[in-house]
Amino acid sequence: MFNLYTFYRSKEWEQLLQSLKLERTNKKGELICEYCNKPLIKKYDIIGHHKQELTESNVNDYNISLNPDNIMLIHFKCHNIIHNRF
C-alpha cells in the first residue's frame, strides 16, 4: 500500500516514467511536452503529471496512479502552471 510520498518514490512509478519516456520519444529522438508542445531537453525538467489528480484515496487504484493514459510528460514549469503555482 502506498501513500503519495511513497508512491512517487516507488520503483513502479519510476519504471512507468522510463517506459513512457521511451514510448513517447518521437522519430527525431525528441520528447515533447504534452502541455506546451516544446521539447523536453533536461532530464530533471520532465514531470509525470496525472490528469486525474492523485490523492491519498486513489493512489492505490492503479487504473489511476499507473495508467499511462492518465499521465502527461511535461516541463516542471508547465506543471506549476497547471497547478496554479505561479
Where do the PLM segments sit?
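Short cysteine-rich loop/turn motifs with clustered Cys
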Residues: E14-H49, K77
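Short linker/helix segments within small regulatory modules
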Residues: Q52-N70
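Positively charged, low-complexity intrinsically disordered regions
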Residues: T25, K51-E53, N80, N84
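Generic macromolecular interface patches on structured domains
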Residues: E30, I46, N58, I81-R85
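Polar helix-capping/helix-linker motif
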Residues: S10-K11, D61, N67, R85
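Short Cys/His-rich Zn2+-coordinating modules
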Residues: Y8-L22, T55-N60
